Structure formats: C-alpha cells, structure tokens
C-alpha cells in the first residue's frame, strides 16, 4: 500500500512538471507607448519585466501587436 501511495505521488509530481514545461505564458509588455506580445514558457519572466519598469499585463493568445496613444511621448518634448 505504501508503494502505491508513493508511486501515485511521483506520478502527480511528474504530471505537474510536464504540464508546467508545456504551458505558454502570454503577456503584454508596454514601454514608451509601444505594446507587444510575449509568449514564453517561464512564469518568472513576467516578474522580470515588471522589475525593469515595463507595464506588463496578461493577455489572451489572439491579441497581436498594438500601439498606445502617442500622448505619453509628447510630454518628453
């Protein structure tokens, strides 16, 4: 019985690892008014972009390149 429980636990851990490796994490990255989609297999990449000062939001897969209003850049001139 103990071996069965251990085997089931190992199978669950393996299934989670495989699912994690195959998952695509898509998010929108915006910087200076330009937004684009990034899809990677790493969850922590979102945090890395956020730490660098980018505006990062989760988006659906069908979202494509967009450009925000130019009003943000007008302030710099």
From Swiss-Prot:
Residue numbers carrying Arginine amide = 40
Q: Where is the signal peptide?
A: 1-23
Kindly state the tissue distribution recorded for this protein.
Answer: Hemocytes.
List keywords of the entry alphabetically.
Amidation, Antibiotic, Antimicrobial, Cleavage on pair of basic residues, Disulfide bond, Secreted, Signal
Q: What is its main location?
A: secreted
For this chain, the family text in UniProt reads: Belongs to the tachyplesin/polyphemusin family.
Tell me, which GO biological process terms does this entry list? defense response to bacterium
What is the official name of this protein in its record?
Answer: Tachyplesin-2
The UniProt entry's GO CC annotations, sorted and at most eight, read:
extracellular region
Q: Does the keyword Signal apply?
A: yes
Spell out the disulfide connections.
26-39, 30-35
Compartments annotated for it: namely: Secreted
Cited function: Significantly inhibits the growth of Gram-negative and Gram-positive bacteria.
Maturation propeptide residues: 41-77
């Amino acid at each position: 019985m103990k071996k069965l429980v251990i085997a089931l636990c190992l199978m669950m851990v393996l299934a989670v690892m495989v699912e994690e490796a195959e998952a695509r994490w898509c998010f929108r990255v915006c910087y200076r008014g330009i937004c684009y989609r990034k899809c990677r297999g790493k969850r922590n990449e979102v945090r890395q972009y956020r730490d660098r000062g980018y505006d990062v939001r989760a988006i659906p897969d069908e979202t494509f390149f967009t450009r925000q209003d130019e009003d943000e850049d007008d302030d710099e001139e």
